[in-house]
């Protein structure tokens, strides 16, 4: 129970996770973090053990780690700039990681419409 509380607190400290809601997804060991228009599924057992990227005492990324979660965060590090984080039907309009944030910023060349976007993120772990 304390580990679950620490993970929830850690998620609430970071702006990217600030609006998160943690929901139990049926299986006691599976949880989901829900963002506006985004759903990230945590690995089985993630809520039952300390998050590998989060210092449970300070609720911040551990020393040497960049991030805890997000479409541009893998293994506690930001993905390289230019990594596709959201694919569209037209290659030139994909969304790319910046290399300095866990977020997936919208391609500035896109219009307001999302008609050309696929229904899931490029990584398959985040639905947008």
Curated annotation (Swiss-Prot):
Tissue specificity comment: Expressed by the venom gland.
Disulphide bridges, residue numbers: 53-76, 67-73, 72-97, 85-104
Keywords noted in UniProt: Cell adhesion impairing toxin, Disulfide bond, Secreted, Signal, Toxin
Keyword Nucleus: no
Gene3D superfamilies tied to this protein: Disintegrin domain (4.10.70.10)
InterPro entries: Disintegrin_CS (IPR018358), Disintegrin_dom (IPR001762), Disintegrin_dom_sf (IPR036436)
Pfam families, per the entry: Disintegrin (PF00200)
Domain Disintegrin: 47-112
Protein's UniProt keywords contain Lipid metabolism: no
GO MF annotation: an example: toxin activity
Motif Cell attachment site: chain residues: 89-91
Localization per record: Secreted
Domain of life (superkingdom): Eukaryota
GO cellular component: extracellular region
Signal peptide location: 1-20
SUPFAM superfamilies: Blood coagulation inhibitor (disintegrin)
Stored SMART domains: DISIN
Chain positions listed as propeptide in the UniProt record: 21-47
Self-association state and partner proteins as the record states: Heterodimer with bitisgabonin (bitisgabonin-2 is the name of the heterodimer); disulfide-linked.
Family per similarity comment: Belongs to the disintegrin family. Dimeric disintegrin subfamily.
Protein purpose: The heterodimer bitisgabonin-2 preferentially inhibits the adhesion of the alpha-4/beta-1 (ITGA4/ITGB1) and alpha-9/beta-1 (ITGA9/ITGB1) integrins to VCAM-1 and also acts as a strong antagonist of alpha-5/beta-1 (ITGA5/ITGB1).
Protein name per Swiss-Prot or TrEMBL: Disintegrin gabonin-2
